[in-house]
Amino acid sequence: LGDVSEASGARWVAQSVSPSPDRFGLFGAPPLSEGYVVLLGDERSKPSPPPSEFLLSVFRRNRAARLVCLSIVLSFVCSLLFWTASKNMGQTVTTPLSLTLEHWEDVQRIASNQSVDVKKRRWVTFCSAEWPTFGVGWPQDGTFNLDIILQVKSKVFSPGPHGHPDQVPYIVTWEAIAYEPPPWVKPFVSPKLSPSPTAPILPSGPSTQPPPRSALYPALTPSIKPRPSKPQVLSDNGGPLIDLLSEDPPPYGGQGLSSSDGDGDREEATSTSEIPAPSPIVSRLRGKRDPPAADSTTSRAFPLRLGGNGQLQYWPFSSSDLYNWKNNNPSFSEDPGKLTALIESVLTTHQPTWDDCQQLLGTLLTGEEKQRVLLEARKAVRGNDGRPTQLPNEVDAAFPLERPDWDYTTQRGRNHLVLYRQLLLAGLQNAGRSPTNLAKVKGITQGPNESPSAFLERLKEAYRRYTPYDPEDPGQETNVSMSFIWQSAPDIGRKLERLEDLKSKTLGDLVREAERIFNKRETPEEREERVRRETEEKEERRRAEEEQKEKERDRRRHREMSKLLATVVSGQRQDRQGGERRRPQLDKDQCAYCKEKGHWAKDCPKKPRGPRGPRPQTSLLTLDD
């Protein structure tokens, strides 16, 4: 310590240190020696500061030190933030259910395209609680696997008490999302595998595998060639079937068109069936069709459709169509006309088979309604003479109750189906007629804003439904016309009753006149203006009457006050006159007239005798005086 003059500090080294003022350490600090800070001083220097003050002085004097420290702090903060974000990202898991909830607006749009409506709470409940209990492998977080979705769908569409009709919109929407995934679903859907060529099958004994069964959607595994010994009308290139609402037997098969070219057609069908094609039913639901043939101008998706090889292919009704028809139309008992028109349109455009007709009736009608329709249809069967027949063999041949052996690929089978559809329509029309009830017809009245034409249609429908009469029959025109007049709106009915030569007017003339009256009705704005004007006029009349009554009361009060004042003034005058001339007191026998005694005034001889003159009139004062 003696080597260093005027040194201070806690610890020192026993080495000679040059007192040169030009020797500095890092950032202007004194030099370091063996890990110890040497604080130098001379006679002019003061004692060295403590270590804490020394470090702060270094930061204040040197910019590089500050930058280095700031960089270290920022690096530490960034590392901490990056580690926290990485940890959070690692803990967040995206599931199909959470993905659909994040894009709920897109899910609702897809559901709207399917003509259904979905709610978020029920969506979560069905996905996480209901469908996992079906035992088909549905996870609680949802899935976009079509195979699992279709198994859940088959459970939902199960007939009878085992079905879940309230879950139909939700599973249909899941199916739509999985079949045509939006951009936010595509990363979570595994791509479809392209079919790979299979090795030729070596000849062997009879195959023990069951014949190939068509699925609802294209399978991801390569399809197996069907055996050429068993041709199928429902070829694979026609598309797989969709699950039906009822467990009816599969469509009946038909023979080939001809035996000569049957083998060639089967070979073509076998070669083309190796490539899985999109389901025609799903294509029909999504509005995407296969490219049409060169000679076709429209795309038709009927149960019986002419295929590319000239053979009719069978496409059943989709469950979505059946669901929409059932829920968007009234029941047969409530409005048989509307449901009959719907079924007639379906029978005309879709050309259904016998199985399709049974499925359609079972979906849209109740059991009792279906039995009534079938009974009426069998009554409409006509014999060879053109009249209704009751022969069981002829009735069963035309309208069988059991599944017939009709081949729709032949002309004879198609003729049977055409006759069956015609009889079914006749049965629907006859079964829709209710017992005669004229009170129901009389209860049909025109609405306030209903046009006469619409009212006439409702009236005719009531005649068809509740009476045995046909409103289109000329013999019933008079009855329909009178009902039209009496049950029209009050303003229209009154004017129709006052028409000249009413008896010669036809129903068409009455409708045209009613339309003219209806169109001349005042608009709501005009009616509002008229009501406002009438209200103002009524208020003015009321005010005028009130003013007149008030004036009358004032005049009456004026007259009464005048009489009262006149009476008061007259009394005051009499009092004043009486005060000036007082009568003297009379004795008992003194005359009031002559003031003599011995007689009274009536016997006074001095009193003049003769007729009494008129009394002087008393003048009345008025308020003007």
UniProtKB/Swiss-Prot annotation:
- Residue runs in coiled coils: none
Q: Which GO terms describe its cellular component?
A: host cell plasma membrane; membrane
Q: Which keywords fit this entry according to its UniProt record? A: Glycoprotein, Host cell membrane, Host membrane, Membrane, Transmembrane, Transmembrane helix
Quick one: where's region Disordered?
195-305, 522-625
User: PROSITE patterns attached here?
Assistant: ZF_CCHC
The transmembrane segments are 67-86
Residue numbers on the Extracellular membrane side: 87-625
Q: Name one GO molecular function term.
A: nucleic acid binding
- Residue ranges that the UniProt entry lists as topological domain Cytoplasmic: 1-66
Task: Mark out the compositionally biased spans (Basic and acidic residues).
Answer: 522-553, 573-606
Q: Which GO biological process annotations does it have? A: virion assembly
Output the InterPro entries linked to this UniProt entry: G_retro_matrix, G_retro_matrix_sf, Gag_p12, Gag_P30, Retrov_capsid_N, Retroviral_Gag-Pol_poly, Retrovr_matrix, Znf_CCHC
> SUPFAM superfamilies from the entry?
Retroviral matrix proteins (SSF47836), Retrovirus capsid protein, N-terminal core domain (SSF47943), Retrovirus zinc finger-like domains (SSF57756)
What does this protein do, in the record's words? Plays a role in viral particle release. Presumably acts by facilitating the fission of the virion bud at the cell surface. May prevent the antiviral activity of murine APOBEC3.
Protein name per Swiss-Prot or TrEMBL: Glyco-Gag protein
Organism whose genome encodes this protein: AKV murine leukemia virus
